[in-house]
Amino acid sequence: MKKDLTLYETRVVGVLLEKEITTPDQYPLSLNALVNACNQKSNRHPVLELDEATVRQTLEALQRKDLVKGSSYGSRVEKYHHRFCNTEFGELKLDAQQVAVVCELLLRGPQTPGELRSRASRMAEFSDVQATESTLKRLLEHKLGPLVVMLPREPGKRESRYMHMFSSDIEPVETAAPSDSGSISAYKAKITDLEVRLEALQEENDALKKKLRQLGQVV
């Protein structure tokens, strides 16, 4: 299994995994649909602004790695589907919960089991946080080698975060004594965590407003 994906490649693969599950009637994706999905504001971190040429180049790189396939499907518009997992062309096999967790890690970066349970539940069922932790354990012990890694717990946090192992851009985690640069890194991490939590609250608020409108109430 190739573990040398760039940020843009992980975003494209994550999007294809996501849309295959959440909007199967619109899958495979055209180049235009893929660009829009890569750049959407919700369920993404970091938020990107990729142009069509960049996404096309990323698709070409993934095709050379046999992780994406493009086909016309009887029309003039070429559409793309992944070969990342659970296909006859690759050796990586994942169950539904593993796919959901890996997808969220590809789309959002490092997350805690609690965050993963909340976010991945749109793609697979997780009865509780323990179910998410069990899924992470299976990914850690995968027969092809660890597919995720647990990061050292950040100061003041109850849970450790996990990140995927499909990228060559994974940065080593500093475990040395705190320094000025370490303090800055910790501060930035706290800001990122707050941004993620705020985004989740905004999504919940939007969903609640939608439900209220469906009930005929004015917000």
Swiss-Prot record:
InterPro entries: DUF480 (IPR007432), WH-like_DNA-bd_sf (IPR036388), WH_DNA-bd_sf (IPR036390). PANTHER family: UPF0502 PROTEIN YCEH. Belongs to the UPF0502 family. This is UPF0502 protein HCH_06091. It comes from the Bacteria.
